Swiss-Prot record:
Pfam families: Disulph_isomer. It comes from the Bacteria. GO terms for biological process: cell redox homeostasis. This is Bacilliredoxin ABC2045. It comes from Shouchella clausii (strain KSM-K16) (Alkalihalobacillus clausii). The lineage of its organism: Bacteria, Bacillati, Bacillota, Bacilli, Bacillales. NCBIfam families: YphP_YqiW. InterPro entries: BrxB/BrxA (IPR009474).
Length: 145
């Protein structure tokens, strides 16, 4: 792959990254960053597997961000970007062995255990409000302080 293409793609996805980081998500861009985060994971974490696809832009990212207005929310927010930060994404997906790779997707962790997972097939074609409700129900069950 040419360096010009890689730089172009970095620029194209920048707003897609910023949408989440502006909402408080911490980007994990290397496998080492993922491993370090998981090693110290406490409380609840919403993991967002980001993507360039339309359902990420029109459904998943807005729903994840809006869900943070709920009364109960995760203690931590992290994101990896599928197709861009490949090693980080592979490292994070390795923490969800019971779920096939899917992007966009969201996992709610309690410590290092996946307690709720929303795969792409539950995002595509869904109304954003339905995704927010899905997350809110998981937050109610797992994120009460």
């Amino acid at each position: 792959m040419s360096m010009a293409y890689e730089e172009y793609m970095r620029q194209v996805v920048l707003p897609m990254r910023q949408e989440l980081t502006d909402a408080g998500f911490k980007e994990l861009t290397t496998a080492e960053a993922v491993e370090d985060y998981i090693a110290d994971a406490e409380g609840t974490t919403l993991v967002f597997i980001n993507s360039v696809c339309g359902c990420a832009a029109g459904l998943a990212r807005p729903a994840a961000i809006y869900s943070l207005q709920h009364d109960h929310t995760p203690d931590h927010l992290v994101t990896v970007f599928a197709g861009q930060d490949k090693e980080a994404t592979a490292a994070m997906r390795s923490k969800f062995p019971d779920y096939p790779p899917s992007s966009p997707s969201m996992a709610l962790l309690k410590g290092t255990e996946v307690v709720h997972f929303i795969p792409r097939e539950d995002i595509e074609g869904a109304e954003p409000e339905a995704i927010v409700r899905n997350l809110a129900l998981a937050y109610n069950e797992h994120c009460q302080k």
